[in-house]
């Protein structure tokens, strides 16, 4: 500003700037070069070059990536190969997980994961030493590559407990901790594992200052929070919510295990506890299906022209910003910087949205 320049729109993240500049939403048609094709990739994408892991990793790094990402496909393209397309129901993959832990010392006794891929569910009941349980869960995440990760109250219990236990097992080495909690959709490489400024490496789940968990490339979607927002239940326990949704279906209710005496239950009937864990893993998937939570997030992203991640985890202001900034750009109106970032500027005077009423207005 001392030279007579006023900088605007300078604090919009590049990934958002791409959507804004090209007027893209969550549904995109793209054309480019296939760098990697995994087992689940379309057959026409598979060649000796695209299925060779070492060669694919080298090609991804040459294109600007950090290594071989745990994805079905990696495609390189430039902005000329991107365009908005008509909305379609994306074939999202969802993984639900649950932990059963010791009351005495907080250790993980057993776990379960269920992956829903197009309506077909694969169960992973997991037992063994605590390190083996965490490693197996991470293997499931990186092999099955889910878009959404759910469970019941994972924001406040399961994810914090896994972070705590992984740090207790490997307190001094991020590289040793990565196989225990490397859930991010990034390569398990040194650059992705090392700590950033005031935050863990990109490969690890991270709880932001607003208490929301982020997992790079994936979307945590707590079924507890979705039920709370949509149903407004009198009580928020999984037992109560499942009976509220399916009052006459015993198969959809929690099993009779006393979680307050989990050490005793695990010692006397471990098979029943594991079955209880699997049931508690399946119910969040059923809750999300019943509430149409994922379809709602995708529809919101399509209308607001944001990523599904922002539609699922962010606030009303981000959705409205996506539309208003495009309008400002079309009309030649400068968008001032906010007071965020390393060099805070003057605060923007204005209003904020209390509530958005659904409906169509003329």
Residue ranges and their predicted role:
Residues 1-88:
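N-terminal accessory regions of nucleic-acid-interacting proteins
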Residues 121, 145, 149, 159, ...:
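Active-site-proximal helix-loop-helix substrate-binding element of RNase H-like nuclease domains
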Residues 26, 32, 36-57, 260-362:
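Common nucleic-acid-contacting/processivity interface regions adjacent to the catalytic cores
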Residues 68-150, 169, 185, 347-359:
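Conserved RNase H-like, two-metal-ion catalytic cores of nucleic-acid enzymes
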Residues 60-62, 66-91, 95-97, 188-213, ...:
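Extended, Lys/Arg-enriched charged tracts that mediate electrostatic binding to polyanionic substrates
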Residues 106-108, 154, 159-165:
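A short acidic (Asp/Glu
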Residues 1, 146-155:
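Acidic beta-strand-to-loop metal/phosphate-binding motif
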